[in-house]
Amino acid sequence: MKPSAECCSPKFWLVLAVLAVSGSKARSQKSPPSIGIAVILVGTSDEVAIKDAHEKDDFHHLSVVPRVELVAMNETDPKSIITRICDLMSDRKIQGVVFADDTDQEAIAQILDFISAQTLTPILGIHGGSSMIMADKDESSMFFQFGPSIEQQASVMLNIMEEYDWYIFSIVTTYFPGYQDFVNKIRSTIENSFVGWELEEVLLLDMSLDDGDSKIQNQLKKLQSPIILLYCTKEEATYIFEVANSVGLTGYGYTWIVPSLVAGDTDTVPSEFPTGLISVSYDEWDYGLPARVRDGIAIITTAASDMLSEHSFIPEPKSSCYNTHEKRIYQSNMLNRYLINVTFEGRNLSFSEDGYQMHPKLVIILLNKERKWERVGKWKDKSLQMKYYVWPRMCPETEEQEDDHLSIVTLEEAPFVIVESVDPLSGTCMRNTVPCQKRIISENKTDEEPGYIKKCCKGFCIDILKKISKSVKFTYDLYLVTNGKHGKKINGTWNGMIGEVVMKRAYMAVGSLTINEERSEVVDFSVPFIETGISVMVSRSNGTVSPSAFLEPFSADVWVMMFVMLLIVSAVAVFVFEYFSPVGYNRCLADGREPGGPSFTIGKAIWLLWGLVFNNSVPVQNPKGTTSKIMVSVWAFFAVIFLASYTANLAAFMIQEEYVDQVSGLSDKKFQRPNDFSPPFRFGTVPNGSTERNIRNNYAEMHAYMGKFNQRGVDDALLSLKTGKLDAFIYDAAVLNYMAGRDEGCKLVTIGSGKVFASTGYGIAIQKDSGWKRQVDLAILQLFGDGEMEELEALWLTGICHNEKNEVMSSQLDIDNMAGVFYMLGAAMALSLITFICEHLFYWQFRHCFMGVCSGKPGMVFSISRGIYSCIHGVAIEERQSVMNSPTATMNNTHSNILRLLRTAKNMANLSGVNGSPQSALDFIRRESSVYDISEHRRSFTHSDCKSYNNPPCEENLFSDYISEVERTFGNLQLKDSNVYQDHYHHHHRPHSIGSTSSIDGLYDCDNPPFTTQPRSISKKPLDIGLPSSKHSQLSDLYGKFSFKSDRYSGHDDLIRSDVSDISTHTVTYGNIEGNAAKRRKQQYKDSLKKRPASAKSRREFDEIELAYRRRPPRSPDHKRYFRDKEGLRDFYLDQFRTKENSPHWEHVDLTDIYKERSDDFKRDSVSGGGPCTNRSHLKHGTGEKHGVVGGVPAPWEKNLTNVDWEDRSGGNFCRSCPSKLHNYSSTVAGQNSGRQACIRCEACKKAGNLYDISEDNSLQELDQPAAPVAVTSNASSTKYPQSPTNSKAQKKNRNKLRRQHSYDTFVDLQKEEAALAPRSVSLKDKGRFMDGSPYAHMFEMPAGESSFANKSSVPTAGHHHNNPGSGYMLSKSLYPDRVTQNPFIPTFGDDQCLLHGSKSYFFRQPTVAGASKTRPDFRALVTNKPVVVTLHGAVPGRFQKDICIGNQSNPCVPNNKNPRAFNGSSNGHVYEKLSSIESDV
């Protein structure tokens, strides 16, 4: 047959190829890639077990199938191992090796590392020497070991020591490779740990030297720590332990911890290894050799499978050990990356870069007394689990065990023992806690599981245990009891802490263990370290605030003492000091005091002190005495302390509530008969304790009832109390007090504030007949003696609620607390009494020396006063010895003058009984006056009741003692400055207001320059020009040497000045005062008077203008008076009326009409030379015409003169103010100084300082009835403007009136229209007090022999003005005395000396001889008893009878009195207003 053509066709070969490929794919699916792995076992390994392990079908899910070659070897030398592995590579084409041996030779691991680095074959050492620690592996090696690294084993060692609180240790190593890593790992761990490690020694032993054991012994003797870490080989460890045993480092109290390298094969234990040796080893029990072989095969297979999956190839098998291709190196490095990260069956089998397992299975083994390794712990997932909660300290049987390490049991019960968990960060207990083990009781528990949990204990009893252990010097292991609580005997067996001690599982029991008789039978108790007993806790009830809570801050003694000091002592002391003080309310040592005025009573003193204590803003009257002020000041300081202390404690007592306990004690009816209450009273306790035992033994019925309400623990009982399930909880007092203090919200309290029943104490239970009891007792007593026990109690047993209670409850301030302030009040009273005595001594004895009397110089008081004044006002004080010693300086001294002024004002204010009259002087004075008392700053004068009375005749020589004193003192002084008194009063005592009715006539030439205290630079003229001749020379000689002002204030009479002294309180005067009317335009002057302020300054202005008008000398056509620098003076006063910025706008009135109708008369007077002061030579005799008078109108004073009077006056020059004829005044002198001609006065008027007589005002008064005509003759040549009385009366109607006050009385009487009822008068018993020796007794009496002016006057008067209250104001008599000796402002040398010495004036009364005044050659001849005839005209009722109103003002031309004026020192007529300002200037 012939072959077919189809067989050779191309289609045929294609089918064959497809079939071939399909066949190859089928074969590939049936047989996956495989990897050859050799398992080499050295020694007596169980091959059957290994075979079963790798034959199991555990790798079917992998893409690579392991092809295992099982090889057994007996030789362990390096040559045999290398030859056998190389043969397997060439014959079996293996790609990995799993090596296991049963030796302790670490050299096998080094050989395997070398083979792997040369052949690039992965080798796994899983057991024996191949798995031992190896340091410094080759970088290209693929050798991996089933075992922990050096660092891992060092960490486990530290965890073991931390578990049992072994913080003090030492390290011993040899030069075996890896020792540096071991030491460095331990150092770095303890440095970065929170545990307080103490590494004492690090010993490096050199085992290569053959110098015997001496060197190693010397090194080991340095070790003192109880824990020693050893790193070396097993052979080296055998030698080291032998030497350590010789030096006593392997006995009881020393613990050695070694790594797995030392332990080696656990089946063989060298005899040198000490009992109790601890080793960290690979887990041989739970991770045996078959499991390791299987995991080794799985690691290589899984890595190859992962490589195949990612790269589609696996490493090619190696055919020889002697050649290595680059391709093989690449594949081996790639496989190494997969070998490091392997996970098999959910287990992490990864390796580190050094070839060690990342998560090895380690165990802690202990060499027990049977010389076998016992597994006591496990290290898994970086956590340590130990079998023993108290480390069993083992020692050789030949040695006796020392009892210095004790096992102590405790019970959790705050605050005595508080159990906490370990710190989650460090896994250890904090520094203030102690590790304590808690057993785990579980039915399903296996032997491998640990039987305890590590906890941390702290508390009051734990701190006591720590202190006792340091004192007695023992160590301990602490664990928590699990069998019961404190301890109770059940069926003859004790449980709890007492049971642990009885069974000798613990040496001691520490905690809240109550000492009782039953327990003391089986154990010994130490002395009690805290007192306790049985207490009852209840829920807090609602409290109430006591009604007397506001009194609680102070005790009753303090309240009583305060009121006693207030009402009896302090108030009485202030009143007494004030009453007897020289300047107090109730003393009248100063004559200016108003009798019957305000007084300081005992009631006011109590009211004042009461207001100071309680800060009451009620009106009180303050004392004035220095002593009483000191007392009140100290009382105010006491009030501050008292009130501050009261306020500080008041809030605490006001919020403090009183709580009522529900039960009073264990014998309370609620406990003994709980069912009698509705609902029944519920109470219970924690069973199996001393509290239950006590109740059972003493209260059987109570114990039976409370069984159903017993609680499992204290926390459960507290919760039941808060929720209302329980009414009372009976338990240990110390525990309940702590719980009450720490309760949230402080809702739970113990009855009776911690009342204790059946008192006992807590103690430490010790084994019976133990040697520790005495040492423990002494240690506890030492804690009490050192005060440490009190510190522990304050730290642990004091709760928050106790602190809050202490903060709220404030103890009462008893008398001891407030004693200091009462002592202060007593000292203040003593000081006040001393001050009171010193005040009177100074006032009555030493005051005069401080005034300069003793030294003759200005006193200290004067110097200080003037020094302060000089500092404030800048006034220089001249205290030259020559000046101050002169009599003139003494009388010109401002200080002396002011003192006299004050003395005079006081005497004026206290007049009572005028010349024996039953009426008081105060009846004539108005209380509402603006004039104030100098010393008291009060209004001291009252208005008159306008009743007339008969003035009793005065004695002729009433003031003879003053006259005698003046004569005796100044009789031999020469004449000096006769006008100085007049000039002094011109400058300093000016009227303040317009008090009388007058009109403005003639030309106004008033010179009132601006006020200044500086002396004027005006050229002086002799003051003795125009003085009278020998008739008054003796009088001038008597007074000329003393003046109130020095020569610097003297000047021309034609330029009358208006000075004020340094103590003046006058106001600025307004007005245009130029004297020449020809140079003044009418409209300009009228405009200057428009809308001037209607204030006190206006009244002052009118007084100045009128006074200047009255002072203006007579004028003649050829004698005119001119001012210096008139334009400047006029501009100055025009500026006074211009509105100024920042000044108040006064109410203005238009006064232009006052001068409107008089302007023409002024011009005529100016042309004719006439005026108010017309020369007497121009008067005619024997005619009815009057020439040279004002406006041709006869003045009222002219009507009082007869023809004979006019004839007498026409022949010569007369006094300006009185009828005295000036015989020694020549016409030559008058011609030289015409300005002084019309204002010349007699010596009597000069001495009195009178500017005018009061009767001069009669020329300005309007008469309601026409006066009788008086024929007056005058020269026809001088008659210019004759006018009849009718024309004069008509002209007066057009005049505007101004009221001017000329005296103190008239000023006060200005406000009489609004006066109220008459004030109280001075009692009659004070009538004679001011009469004898008073310089003002003359004010309300007339000279002897005169009954009234109306009967003796030769001039017709308007009779209806007499004693008519409604007739208008009348010019009253000046307050100044009528005689020169009565003038208090004219001091005498004797007066001055008496004032300096602080004594009364030594005036003496002499009997007056009838007619002596007519014959005596001295100035007494001037005193006359003739009546002074005055006619008063006015629209205002007079203050006194007209017969006692002596005139103080006269017409400047002709006097209205025929008789010469008596030397009247009181006729000045000036008023001192607001004397308080004068006093303040002093």
From Swiss-Prot:
<feature type="modified residue" description="Phosphoserine">
    <location>
        <position position="1058"/>
    </location>
</feature>
<dbReference type="GO" id="GO:0098655">
    <property type="term" value="P:monoatomic cation transmembrane transport"/>
</dbReference>
<dbReference type="InterPro" id="IPR001508">
    <property type="entry name" value="Iono_Glu_rcpt_met"/>
</dbReference>
<feature type="topological domain" description="Extracellular">
    <location>
        <begin position="647"/>
        <end position="817"/>
    </location>
</feature>
<feature type="transmembrane region" description="Helical">
    <location>
        <begin position="558"/>
        <end position="576"/>
    </location>
</feature>
<comment type="function">
    <text>Component of N-methyl-D-aspartate (NMDA) receptors (NMDARs) that function as heterotetrameric, ligand-gated cation channels with high calcium permeability and voltage-dependent block by Mg(2+). Participates in synaptic plasticity for learning and memory formation by contributing to the long-term depression (LTD) of hippocampus membrane currents. Channel activation requires binding of the neurotransmitter L-glutamate to the GluN2 subunit, glycine or D-serine binding to the GluN1 subunit, plus membrane depolarization to eliminate channel inhibition by Mg(2+).</text>
</comment>
<dbReference type="GO" id="GO:0046960">
    <property type="term" value="P:sensitization"/>
</dbReference>
<dbReference type="GO" id="GO:0009636">
    <property type="term" value="P:response to toxic substance"/>
</dbReference>
<dbReference type="GO" id="GO:0035235">
    <property type="term" value="P:ionotropic glutamate receptor signaling pathway"/>
</dbReference>
<dbReference type="GO" id="GO:0005102">
    <property type="term" value="F:signaling receptor binding"/>
</dbReference>
<dbReference type="GO" id="GO:0036094">
    <property type="term" value="F:small molecule binding"/>
</dbReference>
<dbReference type="GO" id="GO:0035094">
    <property type="term" value="P:response to nicotine"/>
</dbReference>
<feature type="modified residue" description="Phosphotyrosine">
    <location>
        <position position="1472"/>
    </location>
</feature>
<dbReference type="Pfam" id="PF10565">
    <property type="entry name" value="NMDAR2_C"/>
</dbReference>
<dbReference type="GO" id="GO:0042734">
    <property type="term" value="C:presynaptic membrane"/>
</dbReference>
<dbReference type="GO" id="GO:0034097">
    <property type="term" value="P:response to cytokine"/>
</dbReference>
<dbReference type="GO" id="GO:0008306">
    <property type="term" value="P:associative learning"/>
</dbReference>
<feature type="compositionally biased region" description="Basic residues">
    <location>
        <begin position="1290"/>
        <end position="1301"/>
    </location>
</feature>
<dbReference type="GO" id="GO:0044877">
    <property type="term" value="F:protein-containing complex binding"/>
</dbReference>
<feature type="glycosylation site" description="N-linked (GlcNAc...) asparagine">
    <location>
        <position position="341"/>
    </location>
</feature>
<feature type="glycosylation site" description="N-linked (GlcNAc...) asparagine">
    <location>
        <position position="491"/>
    </location>
</feature>
<keyword id="KW-0770">Synapse</keyword>
<dbReference type="GO" id="GO:1904322">
    <property type="term" value="P:cellular response to forskolin"/>
</dbReference>
<feature type="modified residue" description="Phosphotyrosine">
    <location>
        <position position="1133"/>
    </location>
</feature>
<feature type="modified residue" description="Phosphoserine">
    <location>
        <position position="1255"/>
    </location>
</feature>
<dbReference type="GO" id="GO:0005261">
    <property type="term" value="F:monoatomic cation channel activity"/>
</dbReference>
<dbReference type="GO" id="GO:0001666">
    <property type="term" value="P:response to hypoxia"/>
</dbReference>
<feature type="modified residue" description="Phosphoserine">
    <location>
        <position position="1303"/>
    </location>
</feature>
<dbReference type="GO" id="GO:0035254">
    <property type="term" value="F:glutamate receptor binding"/>
</dbReference>
<feature type="modified residue" description="Phosphoserine">
    <location>
        <position position="1259"/>
    </location>
</feature>
<feature type="binding site">
    <location>
        <position position="514"/>
    </location>
    <ligand>
        <name>L-glutamate</name>
    </ligand>
</feature>
<dbReference type="GO" id="GO:0016595">
    <property type="term" value="F:glutamate binding"/>
</dbReference>
<dbReference type="GO" id="GO:0048168">
    <property type="term" value="P:regulation of neuronal synaptic plasticity"/>
</dbReference>
<dbReference type="GO" id="GO:0042220">
    <property type="term" value="P:response to cocaine"/>
</dbReference>
<keyword id="KW-1003">Cell membrane</keyword>
<dbReference type="GO" id="GO:0051707">
    <property type="term" value="P:response to other organism"/>
</dbReference>
<dbReference type="GO" id="GO:0043408">
    <property type="term" value="P:regulation of MAPK cascade"/>
</dbReference>
<dbReference type="GO" id="GO:0051290">
    <property type="term" value="P:protein heterotetramerization"/>
</dbReference>
<keyword id="KW-1133">Transmembrane helix</keyword>
<feature type="topological domain" description="Cytoplasmic">
    <location>
        <begin position="624"/>
        <end position="630"/>
    </location>
</feature>
<feature type="modified residue" description="Phosphoserine">
    <location>
        <position position="1143"/>
    </location>
</feature>
<dbReference type="GO" id="GO:0007268">
    <property type="term" value="P:chemical synaptic transmission"/>
</dbReference>
